[in-house]
């Protein structure tokens, strides 16, 4: 065993932990199909949101960790449940009245309200695929509609008929009495209306491969369960899909947690081994509510990328997948700065075990680019933007180049992008919410002391020396908690309750410019 493999096996990073579970489930052997299958799922009822991206990003992290631990081939599929019947019209789509006329129809049988694709389902699938492609995910796309109609599930659907009683025995205890009377794992597609029907099944025949039900007019209808004439209810569908495709690893959100046992048991009833599973926590919006594709109450991938690099979004996905996290625009600056810190630590670290534990290793699948920001963070750029209100990033570069003469847009592309992002973020989220504190007489005395301290400093002084001078003034200012001292300074000078290390900010903004800013407040 190589030292690299030993270090990977010892790693406690969650993608490696998941990869080890998969390898253990296979007893270290290649499956009969010749590869390990990773599956992600997508419900195309609404526009893809950042959680959809997150599931795929996390899945690839585990896939790449598994490839590090073994020589077994892998494959990632993205499965779209586009044959589901429409149950609710999303609030964030055009032509909702038109779509409302197709309730209970498969998503791929509803006209595209955006007027671009063959159907509503095809449009949503295209949106998903476009951003998965944009970020370089290597995957195969599976459509539920195509799989059912092409007969790819036929063998398992016949097996569901053969195991009908056993599956019903598993499912019925999970329902209320009124639902028990009407439930069947099969949902026929009505030959007349094309709707996905949830109706009682009066007869089933495994040899003929058919089910019999009564339609809304009371007419007895017999249909085959194969070739797309029926689909399964979502819980049996999950387990059937695992069995048919021989899935080895699946992730799902906490809303599936209670049903994970059912999916697994159905897979076993159908004669296959269920996959290793990871249940991740759901993202919450600014009000602490679950984000939803149909509500559109979250950040889209495009939203995030308007204000920050993709690596920061991937870091947000990496961190604590089993813990609920609030996902709104105010998490962006923190994740950008944390990414910068992790990137710098990775390239300074010689211990491979610690490198394997660093999030950037998994974000970049072991090929981590080295970025240079010369100690300038996203938060610092936001504060600089706050005081100089630039029309474009060239204004910020005037300050940056004076702070660090080696830094230029052409040799610091990452920092150049951050400057552009910071201006956008400030204009859209910070500017309108700034609230300045009018300085009291006590505050004015403190500001005068800081001004006097700055007057005697050369422009070449280190940021740490400036920070110490401000700290010393605070120690003499009579505050019980120095945090309140700095909070007051931030509110007076920057119009916000928190901010950067003032020594670094003053060094970047300039001593003479800071003196003018203080004089304005006096």
UniProtKB/Swiss-Prot annotation:
Residue interval(s) of motif 'KMSKS' region: 290-294
Subcellular localization, as worded in the UniProt entry: Cytoplasm
Class of the enzyme per the UniProt entry, highest EC level: ligase
GO MF terms, alphabetically ordered: ATP binding; lysine-tRNA ligase activity; tRNA binding
GO biological process, one term: lysyl-tRNA aminoacylation
Binding site for ATP: 293
Listed EC numbers: 6.1.1.6
One cellular-component annotation, GO: cytoplasm
InterPro entries in the record: aa-tRNA-synth_I_codon-bd_sub2 (IPR020751), aa-tRNA-synth_I_CS (IPR001412), aa_tRNA-synth_I_cd-bd_sf (IPR008925), Lys-tRNA-ligase (IPR002904), Rossmann-like_a/b/a_fold (IPR014729)
Pfam families: tRNA-synt_1f (PF01921)
SUPFAM superfamilies noted in UniProt: An anticodon-binding domain of class I aminoacyl-tRNA synthetases (SSF48163), Nucleotidylyl transferase (SSF52374)
Keyword Protein biosynthesis belongs to the record: yes
Record keywords: Aminoacyl-tRNA synthetase, ATP-binding, Cytoplasm, Ligase, Nucleotide-binding, Protein biosynthesis
Main location: cytoplasm
Sequence motif: 'HIGH' region, positions: 44-52
Entry similarity comment: Belongs to the class-I aminoacyl-tRNA synthetase family.
Record-given protein name: Lysine--tRNA ligase
Lineage: Bacteria, Pseudomonadati, Pseudomonadota, Alphaproteobacteria, Rickettsiales
């Amino acid at each position: 065993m190589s030292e690299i493999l030993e270090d990977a096996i010892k790693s406690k990073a969650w993608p490696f932990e998941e990869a080890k579970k998969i390898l253990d489930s296979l007893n270290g052997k290649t499956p009969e199909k010749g590869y390990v299958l990773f599956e992600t799922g997508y419900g195309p009822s609404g526009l893809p949101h950042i959680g959809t991206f997150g599931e795929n990003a996390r899945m690839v992290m585990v896939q790449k960790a598994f490839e590090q631990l073994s020589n077994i081939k892998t494959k990632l599929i993205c499965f779209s449940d586009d044959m589901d019947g429409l149950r609710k019209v999303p609030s964030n789509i055009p032509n909702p009245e038109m779509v409302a006329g197709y309730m209970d129809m498969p998503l791929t049988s509803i006209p595209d309200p955006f007027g671009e694709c063959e159907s509503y389902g095809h449009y949503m699938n295209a949106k998903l695929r476009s951003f998965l492609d944009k970020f370089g995910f290597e995957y195969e796309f599976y459509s539920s509609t195509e799989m059912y109609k092409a007969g790819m599930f036929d063998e398992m659907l016949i097996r569901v008929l053969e195991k009908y009683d056993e599956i019903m025995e598993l499912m019925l205890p999970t329902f209320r009495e009124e639902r028990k009377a009407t439930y069947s794992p099969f949902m026929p597609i009505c030959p007349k209306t094309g709707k996905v029907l949830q109706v009682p099944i009066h007869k089933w025949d495994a040899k003929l491969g058919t089910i019999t039900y009564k339609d809304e007019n009371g007419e007895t209808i017999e249909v085959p369960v194969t070739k797309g004439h029926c689909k399964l209810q979502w819980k049996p569908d999950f387990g059937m899909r695992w069995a048919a495709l021989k899935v080895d690893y699946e992730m799902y959100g906490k809303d599936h947690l209670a049903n994970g046992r059912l999916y697994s048991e159905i897979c076993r009833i159908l004669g296959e081994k269920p996959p290793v599973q990871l249940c991740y926590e759901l993202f919450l919006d600014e009000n602490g509510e679950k984000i939803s594709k149909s509500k559109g109450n979250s950040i889209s991938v495009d939203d995030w990328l308007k204000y920050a690099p993709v690596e920061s979004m991937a870091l947000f996905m990496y961190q604590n997948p089993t813990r609920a996290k609030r996902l709104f625009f105010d998490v962006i600056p923190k994740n950008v700065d944390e990414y910068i810190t992790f990137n710098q630590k990775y390239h300074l670290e010689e211990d491979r075990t610690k490198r394997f534990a660093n999030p950037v290793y998994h974000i970049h699948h072991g090929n981590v680019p080295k970025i240079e920001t010369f100690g300038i963070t996203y938060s610092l750029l936001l504060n600089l933007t706050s005081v100089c209100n630039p029309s474009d990033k060239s204004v910020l570069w005037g300050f940056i180049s004076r702070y660090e003469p080696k830094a230029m847009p052409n040799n610091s592309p990452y920092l150049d992008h951050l400057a552009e992002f910071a201006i956008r973020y400030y204009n859209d989220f910070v500017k309108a919410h700034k609230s300045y504190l009018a300085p009291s007489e006590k505050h004015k005395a403190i500001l005068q002391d800081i001004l006097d301290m700055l007057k005697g400093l050369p422009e070449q002084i280190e940021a740490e020396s400036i920070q110490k001078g401000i700290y010393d003034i605070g120690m003499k200012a009579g505050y019980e908690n120095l945090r309140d001292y700095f909070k007051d300074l931030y509110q007076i000078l920057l119009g916000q309750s928190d901010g950067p290390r003032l020594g670094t900010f003053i060094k970047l903004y300039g001593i003479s410019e800071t003196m003018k800013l203080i004089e304005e407040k006096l």
